[in-house]
């Protein structure tokens, strides 16, 4: 075989065989059914067309009959009116006839003869006209001959001829009028047919247009979806940019001071600042916090004027602000300062009361609120003097972040917690110098005194204030006694959580008890001894409140400083549960 020659495969080897025809019974049956259905549809349409034509003809027939009826009614009305006119004319002629009664029989006879002779030519003429004009002229001839035979007077004959002539003329034109009516009805029929034909053509055009629209959407629906998607996207973008513009406008109006809430906050701050003073236990001229001195020797904070008697003002502040100094420097107004005196303080509640004499009438007591009505997330303002008098009257805004917090406090700075402080949590910025400052609600009422904050590198916005109801009760004790006398059960206690297994086994403490305080020693004749408490007892509940540790125990006991009532203690003694009454006075 020659390699240069192209190899060709015979067509008989690779040609595709012709497909055999398969008889599709279902398809032929479907086509036959469709054909029969189309024929039936055509027959129905043809039948409906005939029915419509019959209805049109019937309607035209009815319309024609109705029209003829109306014409007959009008004809009768015209005849009636004409007869009435004829009757009136006859009455008038009768009156004139009475006036002519004086004429003799002779003249009347002459008139009759003359009328007879005059009617003969007319009679001949009417007979001649009978051959030309037919029935209509014959009737007129009979009437004329009858009048001549009766021999009526000339006036009466003329009147009868007048009354007969219009009636004859009306009937003489009735036949052309019917022809005109037929032509009119035929024209109306043709006009209605044209209207129906036009209506059918319009319906056909509408259907064809609908079919074209449907075919267009079927063919181009992907493109239509893309176009609709683009339009929706543009509308969404427009709505987004419109909202952004509205927000920008709102922010602009807020900065312009048009918002009602900001105006209210401004008024509250303006009034409340006058009741907040600076309290400093260092009487030197430098009123700025110094890093070179010990914090306990140079503590600076804020105070709130809550009462004014004469020229003396009473100030709420913190015990850690006044420290151990009895004299305090009180700065108010435009850097005016006086020396105040600490009349009472309580380290357990971190509260102190300072009294000073101020003659300035602008210094007014702040309105007291009710801390029992504080709500979570309630907006508040914090007013104080952070970092000293250089930033006095600072106002920060926030909300109430938490209620009924029990915050452990290290009072003596020995890295051990000494007490639990009852407070509510705020998120407003609190800095050194804000201690003792005011927490006011949206109505400008004092609801708390700033006490402390959590100062850790990974904690922000956690400050605490003493509820004003507790502050007022303790301040009352401090005003009268200079201190708060707390009840003391005179027992030494240890946390159950700090016990090891041997100590738990020694007192037969059940395994389920993992909280409370263990009594180590009981002072003789003390409140605990009188109540029946013994060494080795474990107090797990006091006054219906769960005791977790010694801080909670002290807080529950100290909360009864004002009433000193008898409370119930739930204890475990040698593994057995027992209730004991403790008198706090």
Swiss-Prot record:
Record-annotated membrane-spanning stretches: 224-244
Broad EC category: hydrolase
Sorted UniProt keywords: Cell membrane, Hydrolase, Membrane, Protease, Serine protease, Transmembrane, Transmembrane helix
Basic and acidic residues bias spans: 21-82, 95-113, 126-139
EC code(s) of this entry: 3.4.21.-
Membrane topology: Single-pass membrane protein
Ranges for domain PDZ: 516-575
Chief site of localization: membrane
GO molecular function terms listed in the Swiss-Prot or TrEMBL record: serine-type endopeptidase activity
Catalytic residues, chain numbering: 320 (charge relay system), 350 (charge relay system), 435 (charge relay system)
Subcellular locations according to the entry: Cell membrane
GO CC annotation: plasma membrane
GO biological process, one term: proteolysis
Compositional bias annotation for Polar residues: 84-94, 114-124, 151-175
Disulfide pattern: none
Region (Disordered): 1-184
Tree of life domain: Bacteria
Family: Belongs to the peptidase S1C family.
Protein's recorded name: Serine protease HtrA-like
Organism in which the protein naturally occurs: Staphylococcus epidermidis (strain ATCC 35984 / DSM 28319 / BCRC 17069 / CCUG 31568 / BM 3577 / RP62A)
